[in-house]
UniProtKB/Swiss-Prot annotation:
GO terms for cellular component: plasma membrane; side of membrane. Residues 209-236 form a propeptide. It is found in: Cell membrane. It comes from the Eukaryota. Glycans are attached at N192, N195, N198. The lineage of its organism: Eukaryota, Fungi, Dikarya, Ascomycota, Saccharomycotina. The gene is PGA43. This is Predicted GPI-anchored protein 43. Residues 1-24 form the signal peptide. A lipid is attached at G208 (GPI-anchor amidated glycine). Keywords: Cell membrane, Glycoprotein, GPI-anchor, Lipoprotein, Membrane, Signal.
Amino acid sequence: MHQRNHHSILLTLLLYLQSIVALARIIDPEFGTYSNPNPRKYPQCQANDLVKLSSCCNELLHKLDQCKSDDLACECCALQSIDRDCYHLCPGNPSTNFLTVLLQDCAQLSEINACALPFKKTDDLLVDKKKGTPNSKSAVQALEADEKYDASLKSKVHNKVDEIKSHVKQDQFLKKKIKLLIDKDETFAIQNHSNNSNNTISAKSESGSVCLTSSYLNSPIIILCAILTGTLFAMY
């Protein structure tokens, strides 16, 4: 009996827990589970506030661009103005974090209004450039010297070529006899060809008749001509 009572108590507890979970799901809306567990400590900026903040920062950053080089007072004046005049439009905005990094350079002027300090009227970089004009001229002179050096090199090479041409004259090649070396078999073939051509030409010149040429004896027409001429001489 005691065990049965124990089991019944456990079942009732389980049913009770399930009913509590079901009621919690019905009462609590679903989007409640997506709420931010760590809400922001600063008020949310509206869209108009962000537009004002952006225009204010752009205006002061433009003044920062007009500062002379190494003018700490001018630069810190612009940064302090952004921190003082712009970020009150949207307090606690996370974008102020980058400004804290920039203001580290102005730490020595943190208790002073940098805008009340005198700004530089001349730019040190421009002065350095003006002082550096002789150096620029010397650089130009160095370039001109390099060009002259290159030209002298070209003239030297040209002179060397002229000297070589003066030593080598074309008359040496014109007066020099050139010997052609021909193989013995080729010379024998050339001589036979020249002898055959000479025999043919001499035979043509000795006899006005084509029938008496030795090179034409193999032709049957010429043989018939010779027979006819022989019979004609025999008849007379």
